[in-house]
Amino acid sequence: MWMNFESLQIARAYLFGEVKYLDLMLVLNIIDIITGVIKAWKFKELRSRSAWFGYVRKMLSFLVVIVANAIDTIMDLNGVLTFATVLFYIANEGLSITENLAQIGVKIPAVITDRLHVIESDNDQKTEKDDQAAG
């Protein structure tokens, strides 16, 4: 079967723009899925339904990048919004992979785990403030 990769590149450029690190985001998504499955298998929590929803969430993150690219194009932001969105998802995947590896039993350097705790506590505080403001 012959595939026209030039057409794929055109579609990629149209949907995602010329954003950097999109390939890294894809690779980290795959690594996160693999480490998540290993973690779930280790703790005997491997469920096809919850895994399926996890995969859908991963795909939807690319949809968010497409929307960010559309907004970027309409507002003539030169790719800033799309780039920031991709960086957000890269950081999120990196954190998730690190958490999965730590729960599996892989030793993680203290600098990284300390930073994870700071980010996690910042997120918890923000969630509490949002809940108080809404309620």
Curated annotation (Swiss-Prot):
GO biological process: killing of cells of another organism
Predominant place of localization: host cell
Membrane disposition: Multi-pass membrane protein
Keyword annotations from UniProtKB, A to Z: Cytolysis, Host cell lysis by virus, Host membrane, Membrane, Transmembrane, Transmembrane helix, Viral release from host cell
Annotated compartments: Host membrane
Key word Cytoplasm present: no
Matching InterPro entries: Phage_holin_4_1
Keyword Membrane: yes
A cellular component annotation (GO) from this entry: membrane
Family: Belongs to the bacteriophage holin family. Cp-1 holin subfamily.
Name of protein: Probable holin
Organism the protein comes from: Bacillus phage phi105
Underlying gene: 45
